[in-house]
Amino acid sequence: MSETVLPNHLIHFSETSLLKLPPSLYKTCKTYLNQEDIKKIQKAYSFAFYAHAGQKRKDGSDYITHPVAVTEILLELKMDPDSVCSALMHDVLEDCNVQKNNLAKIFGDDVAHIVDGVSKLGKIETKNIADNNANNLQKMALAMANDVRVVLVKLCDRLHNMRTIEYVPRKKQIQKARETLELYGPLALRVGMQDIRAELEDLSFRCIHPMRAKMLEN
């Protein structure tokens, strides 16, 4: 097998010298995964940590806090190790100049497929939902995903982004909330994720109609 050539910013990543998982991730992982699985997840965390080095979230926190939070949500669903690895690395193709074949060589074809699917699914967000039938968009998303694990990782990604949407400019908040109502809420229903669907819809409503949401609370 030929040597895997990674971008320069991943020079510190080593499969033989891995970073420790954040305590919250490790604690949940060990409740249902074996040590071999956890080591693979540790490798994915190390890869994501170095891939996102220097990147920041809108709130000023290190970007790696986002994939970690997404993974914490996914772990609540007791997902398989490849899904967990994919959640940790779900943004590396889009944001870090990493190639799909890099992931396939290091983590296997399944992980590469899921991460690539999440990246492609995210591109639907750039379409103008007003110009498309929402049901058709949902069907397109499911067809593009071709694997329910892709949809689940993307739903967890969107859920964390909606939980932290206050740091995004107001115009983009509205856009993301409408996308969530039109696409991700119904997608969650289609794959049986009722709790995620309910929270996505609640967060979207609060974003679009903050005053009405406050009135309903009182």
What spans do the regions from the language model cover?
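Active-site helical microenvironments for divalent-metal-assisted chemistry
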Residues: M1-N218
